[in-house]
From Swiss-Prot:
Transmembrane segments: 410-430
Positions on the Lumenal side per record topology: 27-409
Organism: Bos taurus
Protein's recorded name: Dolichyl-diphosphooligosaccharide--protein glycosyltransferase 48 kDa subunit
UniProt-listed InterPro entries: DDOST_48_kDa_subunit (IPR005013), OST48_MD (IPR055459), OST48_N (IPR055457)
Keywords: Endoplasmic reticulum, Membrane, Signal, Transmembrane, Transmembrane helix
Chief place where the protein resides: endoplasmic reticulum
Length: 439
């Protein structure tokens, strides 16, 4: 009997183990695709920073036949990291179309390439408005290379002045120079969603480092992208780095100094701080906004009416929150606008922060119809914030009009004077008797 009870308990325990595992793995599920599993050791500092922030990492090689992003119409992961630049074919059910569908579904993707870039990453970049240079090419800069460069001038020292001016994306603290070795990119000029996060200097270009230049390079000067980003219209985020070494422990801990005479030497690069900041942004730990309670009413009242009347004085309030360290806190912004729209905006005004919310008072236009209170906030580095509340505005009722309008007094006077004149004329005409003519 005891043996049977032990077997039953053992069976229940086996059933509970997966549930306990799911309960423990409560962080963002992240699939990491690698060229080889040795990258877990050579890039351990970056992966450790993700684990310390609660990410649940699943490491697999990019050609693993069991790979899958979607199962039964549901995404198996929240984030995707591709550290396999040389992959020629993804394994399992993953391909460029699947990754594009993952992005369309709101997933976040971090891609690191290198000079040994394969066709899948090139196609994925094209889907996102990024064009990689050819295989075996590298970014070259004969004026801004590191002292440890082997002679091809492909170990680039990127100045922080070339970073995108967006603290939400690249971090708020000042950084040491960035060490970069990899392939160059250019952005599609017709894609307004692409972000030039880190560009090359004016003396940089992308070409084959072991061949003489016989044609115009693919990317030249400031058009050479070292790191690029994308925030889609559904707030999905993607980052492309032309360098896999950028995320390596060796580059994180390396000293950096330009080979130019008199250049300052730094004991450590700014790669780690920038990599952490980029990962926080792309995985939506930074720059995420949401709309809280929205209220509107006439000034002096507390509840919204069934319909407003033209020229009413109204008050509009909205709560906007920002995700910070896993908690929602009030957002601090001074450029949030409210529009009162029918077809075109009739009123556009700035919202002022009062306590934990933004509010404003304004007078409705002397136009009736169906209007919207609309907040459409779209700023660099932040998710797109949109709020729309529809209301009706009716004309004045008959009893709400003034009995006498001062501007109409002349017309009143003319009407009464005409009536008085007609009355006097009638009296005179009816009661006047003509004198009889005498013979």
């Amino acid at each position: 009997m005891a043996t049977r009870a032990a077997r039953v308990w053992s069976g229940w325990w086996l059933l509970l183990l997966p549930l306990l595992g799911l309960a423990g793995a409560s962080g963002p599920r992240t699939l990491v695709l690698l060229d080889n599993l040795n990258l877990r050791e050579t890039h351990s500092l970056f992966f450790r920073s993700l684990k310390d922030r609660g990410f649940v990492l699943t490491f697999k090689t990019a050609d693993d036949p069991s790979l899958s992003l979607i199962k039964y119409g549901e995404f198996l992961y929240d984030n995707l990291i591709i550290f396999s630049p040389s992959v020629e074919d993804f394994g399992g059910n993953i391909n460029v179309e699947t990754i594009s569908a993952f992005i369309d579904g709101g997933g976040s993707v971090l891609v690191a390439a290198s000079s040994d870039i394969g066709d899948p990453l090139r196609e994925l970049g094209s889907e996102c408005g990024i064009e990689f240079d050819e295989e075996k090419t590298a970014v070259i800069d004969h004026h801004n290379y590191d002292v440890s460069d082997l002679g091809q001038h492909t170990l680039i020292v990127a100045d922080t002045e070339n970073l995108l001016k967006a603290p939400t994306i690249v971090g708020k603290s000042s950084l040491n120079p960035i060490l970069f070795r990899g392939v160059g990119m250019v952005a599609d000029p017709d894609n307004p969603l692409v972000l030039d996060i880190l560009t090359g200097s004016s003396t940089s270009y992308s070409f084959f480092p072991d061949k003489p230049i016989t044609q115009y390079p693919h990317a030249v000067g400031k058009n050479t992208l070292l790191i690029a980003g994308l925030q889609a219209r559904n707030n999905a985020r993607v980052i492309f780095s032309g360098s896999l070494d950028f995320f390596s422990d060796a580059f994180f801990n390396s000293a950096v100094q330009k080979a130019a005479p008199g250049s300052q030497r730094y004991s450590q690069t700014g790669n780690y701080e920038l990599a952490v900041a980029l990962s926080r942004w792309v995985f939506k730990e930074e720059g995420v906004l949401r709309v809280g309670p929205v209220s509107h009413h006439r000034v002096g009242e507390t509840a919204p009416p069934n319909a407003y009347t033209v020229t009413d004085l109204v008050e509009y309030s909205i709560v906007i929150e920002q995700l910070s360290d896993g908690k929602w806190v009030p957002f601090d912004g001074d450029d949030i606008q409210l529009e009162f729209v029918r077809i075109d905006p009739f009123v556009r005004t700035f919202l002022k922060r009062k306590g934990g919310k933004y509010s404003v008072q304004f007078k409705l236009p002397d136009v009736y119809g169906v209007f919207q209170f609309k907040v459409d906030y779209n700023r660099l580095g932040y998710t797109h914030l949109y709020s729309s509340t529809q209301v009706s505005v009716r004309p004045l009722q008959h009893t709400q009009y003034e009995r006498f309008i001062p501007s109409a007094y002349p017309y009143y006077a003319s009407a009464f004077s005409m009536m008085l004149g007609l009355f006097i004329f009638s009296v005179v005409f009816l009661h006047m008797k003509e004198k009889e003519k005498s013979d």
